[in-house]
Amino acid sequence: MEEGSMFRSLLAILQWWGFNVTVIIMNKWIFQKLDFKFPLSVSCVHFICSSIGAYIVIKVLKLKPLIVVDPEDRWRRIFPMSFVFCINIVLGNVSLRYIPVSFMQTIKSFTPATTVVLQWLVWRKYFDWRIWASLVPIVGGILLTSVTELSFNMFGFCAALFGCLATSTKTILAESLLHGYKFDSINTVYYMAPFATMILGIPALLLEGSGILSWFEAHPAPWSALIIILSSGVLAFCLNFSIFYVIHSTTAVTFNVAGNLKVAVAVMVSWLIFRNPISYMNAVGCGITLVGCTFYGYVRHMLSQQTPGTPRTPRTPRSKMELLPLVNNDKLEGKV
């Protein structure tokens, strides 16, 4: 790889890490430090900011060409995806409301396992035995982390776990519902974020509206807090742009490894800021999980490099877009 190309790849990875970790930390700060305990409303703010941002990028600045979708397909394909997309984001923010960033990020590493199991159980897809074997350290690491978590909260744990299922469902549905459309992260947000806003707006208003009014009256500096909340939404959209940049600046393997290292960075930064207690065995469990995710990505990449004469598993990844980091769900959701 040329020196200039290596520099661009490194820059792309660093800015992606920066936006991703900042959004996660800001969301946790909003819930914990600002005492704004309304995950539905935070998610809705992110959807609105992402809708506006995607419109500006595509329609006003014309930095990305619009991928045209038939009106019928918008409701038949995009809307169901947007519903799962919305649930996925909300569950992530709900889990952040109740459990530490370190625990939440580790649980989300369970996504490869839930994806493989769902495809096997529901869609009856065959997987090479090496895929199953590579999931063992992920599952073991998650179990060790969960039983040794000092700030364990069952509701937050379940939200994060169901978030993994939502991520897996979204990924699987995308293969069929979005077939024929080559969406990038910006076009994905352009179509899905408005639907997600529509889906979540009324529930957020009904369930959290009165609580937000009470918070606004009781908070010593509500306007400053609202600026922080709005800023998190703007940064969440910027994250989508960073994802687009890093996908086109790195190889699949580099992207996978960088995605797993990003989780380690998020865990470390969150601990430095929030100082949530982490036991030795808890840290070991987190480490095992991340190593397992990296190994899983390596196995899938090796299977994808098989020669044409070698039997392939039906879902051996065929492109970089199928090898996005396995410990986050940035492929279709960005992080709005």
Swiss-Prot record:
Localization: Membrane
One GO biological process term is:
UDP-galactose transmembrane transport
Q: Name one GO cellular component term.
A: Golgi apparatus
Record key words, sorted: Membrane, Sugar transport, Transmembrane, Transmembrane helix, Transport
Q: Which residues form a coiled coil?
A: none
What sections of the protein cross the membrane? 11-31, 38-58, 83-103, 131-151, 154-174, 193-213, 227-247, 254-274, 278-298
Molecular-function GO terms, alphabetical: GDP-fucose transmembrane transporter activity; UDP-galactose transmembrane transporter activity; UDP-glucose transmembrane transporter activity
Q: Does the keyword Transit peptide apply?
A: no
Reading the lineage from the top rank, the first entry is Eukaryota
Pfam families hit by this protein: TPT
Question: Which membrane topology describes this protein?
Answer: Multi-pass membrane protein
**Family statement:** Belongs to the TPT transporter family. TPT (TC 2.A.7.9) subfamily.
Q: What does this protein do?
A: Nucleotide sugar transporter that specifically transports UDP-galactose.
- What is the protein name given in its UniProt record? UDP-galactose transporter 1
Organism, scientific name: Arabidopsis thaliana
Gene it is expressed from:
UDP-GALT1
